[in-house]
Design a protein with these regions (language model features):
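Glycine-rich beta-alpha loop elements in corrinoid/cobalamin-binding modules
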Residues: 26, 34-37, 42-78, 85, ...
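N-terminal [4Fe-4S]-dependent radical SAM core
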Residues: 198-201, 209, 318-369
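Intrinsic disorder/low-complexity segments
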Residues: 1-24
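A cross-taxonomic marker for long C-terminal extensions/tails that follow the last structured domain
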Residues: 308, 577-629
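Conserved SAM/AdoMet-binding glycine-rich loop
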Residues: 28-34, 228, 255, 403-509, ...
């Protein structure tokens, strides 16, 4: 089936024309697949709230949850298994196919359970008599250790998630090689200096998942007849779907304009030189989208010319133009309250990919995602994109304004849990917001990113806990005071440990982000860092952690002046398509890939309370030194 063929309700309306009011426009703002399945991603909600303040008509949809619900139902699975037959040569997939009738029979029930609509299914799922068990069940956690005899709901959620993941694996192995539950063709955009591979995938034969996605898109367009379709692309795993959908809109609704923005554009497309991209979109906007979309509406209404567009790429005479006006922004306090209309919380799935309760927060719970403040109040870390607006421009509202927004969002969604998605919430703002919540006697739960500052003493941590803080996440990074100073992190191991202890004593869970492979880091320093992490787990002052390998980016201090950090960039020439991660030379005198594997292996076990007494060298497949702390 070609990309412009009719399927479902995807047939274009003949002679589709827009009558654009001089004052208002119709926007359809979309989050392409896939982000998270438990709650809406916080981009279109912000833009919808703002644009509606300016009298525009705005519809929004999460194509990710739409797509997943379109897949995980009896009708689709019947079509899927009928189309694949028994997948010869793939034993794991044959195992699933052998039980395909049970997958079809159970899928609607599992979805209802994960949506929170049928809690009575928990005992059936938990006792392992209801669900077929595919390859994902072969490596599951020790359920008795993780949940004991009382954690029936949590145990059932974990098993139901394995069931969902088995089906995702089956789809990927048999029909749609790009499909995953939280990303879609991520490898095509994760590091893409050239557009060729992405375009080849977009022009290849469509899969059953692609067809379903376009069918869903077409229904949204028919429902609101938009003048502008906007795609918020936060991650590489959302880009393929955004371009696939954008091309379909341009081909079938030439009167409708397509615009792409979001975190991916902000970091990757600041030197955009790939004209072919504009076969899939009409405009690309970078950084905060409120003012660019407001100006774009005026431009499309012929109220301003292109010189007044804000941070917008467009094609003119087959050449890319950039509008500039980079410094113009809407003050954060004037952005309005995010609007969740069109994103029904009851449709989302609370998953449990791991048994660790802190780690589960990212996938379990229908959190109201919102920013307390814009940017990072520190914005000095050498590995971070500190020259970009989303980091560099710190802008915080008053505590009263922040809590007013929280109260408004609670009324909209019916949920009292908040995930603050700030780059880093400041201790002072958290103190003020917590005090305001207590004074208003508002019952909420909240969590988000912090820096392990000295300000997080016992008094502040207890205040935050009393106001509803349940967890924090922050960076210990390389866990070496020498390297923390080199990267200008602004924290030390000692103050991180003290802050983590104060949070834990207040009943607040702690997750820490960790890093390895920073230039000049020795193997001894890496092993010492793992020992710091082991001790924090052993003391119980951190509940969850994750190691990232250092990546040099073009917009970070270490990418702009690599020689200050002992590294050499191999090229400063911009790529035509994506420009964020850059290649660099540093000669580590050890196998960094093997070290990364050992760090992650050890920490995964620490998170599950295992191996805390095991010698660190036994987590690695290469010879490593003993820690020296």
């Amino acid at each position: 089936m070609g990309r412009n063929a009719e399927f479902g309700t995807g047939r274009p309306i003949e002679n589709h024309k827009h009558t654009i009011d001089s004052q208002t426009m119709k926007f359809l703002l979309l989050t392409p697949p896939l982000t998270q399945l438990n709650t809406p991603y916080p981009a279109t909600t912000v833009l919808k709230g703002f644009l509606q303040m300016h009298k525009h008509q705005v519809a929004q949809a999460d194509l990710g949850i739409d797509l997943v619900l379109g897949i995980y139902n009896r009708r689709f699975l019947q079509r899927l298994f009928a189309s694949t037959g028994n997948p010869v040569g793939k034993p794991g997939m044959q195992r699933i196919y052998a039980n395909h009738d049970r997958y079809v029979a159970c899928v609607d029930d599992v979805v209802r359970f994960l949506q929170g609509k049928d809690a009575t299914l928990a005992p059936r799922i938990a006792n392992r008599t209801l669900l077929p068990e595919g390859p994902r069940f072969d490596n599951m956690a020790d359920l008795e250790w993780a949940y004991g005899t009382s954690g029936t709901d949590d145990r059932a959620r974990y098993l139901a998630t394995l069931f969902i993941e088995d089906i995702a694996d089956y789809i990927r192995e048999t029909t749609a090689p790009y499909f995953d539950l939280i990303r879609y063709a991520e490898h095509l955009a994760a590091y893409a200096p050239e557009f060729d591979e992405m375009e080849a995938a977009l022009n290849a034969q469509t899969t059953i998942v692609d067809h379903l996605l376009i069918d869903i898109l077409s229904q949204h367009i028919l429902a609101c007849n938009p003048d502008v379709v906007g795609f918020a692309v936060p991650f590489p795993g959302c880009l393929y779907a955004a371009l696939l959908c954008g091309k379909w809109v341009k081909d079938n609704y030439p009167g409708t304009k397509v615009v792409i923005g979001g975190g991916f554009a902000n970091t990757e497309w600041r030197s955009l030189a790939e004209e072919r991209l504009f076969k899939y979109t009409d405009f690309v906007v970078i950084d905060d989208g409120e003012l660019p979309l407001l100006r774009l509406a005026k431009y499309l209404n012929n109220e301003i010319d292109a010189t007044q567009l804000v941070r917008t790429y467009y094609l003119e005479n087959n050449a890319i133009r950039y509008s500039g006006n980079d410094a113009e922004n809407i003050p954060f306090a004037e952005g309005g309250t995010p609007c969740f209309e069109g994103l029904e919380m009851g449709r989302y799935l609370s998953m449990a990919e791991v048994t660790n309760p802190m780690h589960q927060l990212w996938s379990n719970g229908k959190w109201n995602k919102m920013m307390l403040s814009h940017g990072c109040y520190w914005a000095k870390c050498a590995f971070c994109d500190t020259c970009l607006d989303y980091i560099a421009r710190y802008d915080a509202p008053t505590a009263q304004q922040a809590v007013d927004r929280m109260a408004d969002i609670m009324r909209q969604t019916g949920q009292s849990g908040f995930h603050f998605v700030d780059e880093a919430m400041s201790p002072q703002l958290l103190k003020n917001v917590s005090t305001e919540l207590i004074n208003r006697q508002m019952t909420v739960s909240y969590w988000g990113n912090i820096r392990f500052e000295k300000a997080y003493n016992a008094e502040l941590c207890n205040l935050m806990a009393d106001a509803g803080c349940i967890a924090v996440s922050g960076g210990l990074e390389v866990a070496s005071n020498r390297l923390l100073k080199l990267m200008n992190k602004g924290v030390s191991i000692e103050q991180t440990v003290n802050a983590a202890r104060n949070f834990t004593n207040a009943g607040i869970m702690v997750h820490t982000y960790l890093m390895y492979g920073f230039p000049t880091e020795t193997l001894q320093e890496t092993i010492n860092a793992l020992e710091v992490v082991r001790r924090m787990f052993d003391e119980g002052i951190v509940q969850s952690a994750f190691w990232h390998r250092y990546a040099m980016t073009a917009h970070s201090p270490s990418g702009r002046e690599p020689e200050k950090y002992g590294a050499v960039r191999t090229t400063f020439e911009p790529n035509p398509f994506c420009n964020n991660e850059v290649d660099f030379d540093y000669d580590f005198d050890y196998d960094i890939e093997a070290v990364g594997e050992g760090l992650k292996f050890a920490t995964y076990n620490f998170m599950n309370g295992l191996g805390l007494d095991r010698p660190l060298r036994k987590w690695f497949r290469i010879k490593v030194p003993n820690p020296k702390i």
